[in-house]
């Protein structure tokens, strides 16, 4: 099983579940930082992978996302109806979705194929219910083990995994206290912004 490991609670709980079920040798965790990802979440991701004993790699996405954006905005589109060429523009929201899709549809899906297995969807029920997700991005994957859990249940499951299942701190304490954030823009930092949702 291949899992995108961001340094947040959702992907960490998903990773711990699959390591418990499949064993660490059958789990590949990948951190995919962009220029918006904090050193803190990148460190938490690596600490989590190390504690779980799983396979781990880091594949940055900034260059590929910028390349995609340039292709989309600089390639002329011809209107045969209006007999003219035009070009598209990319809003900040579209660029956020490009990052999510690059992670899910390119990196994680490609790694899963090469690793010889499936990949997971790390979305929780809170995000799915309000539509805080990206098609072909963070909501793609063969299985969604926390898809029917509200965000506060994900935190509770994380504590349970530490205390009862692994009986040690496999999920770092910082993962329970850091501000939840997709880290897709400068407004979504774990220090000041975070997700646009208020989780109970």
Region spans (language model):
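ATP/NTP-dependent adenylation/nucleotidyl-transfer catalytic domains that generate, transfer
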Residues: 1-200
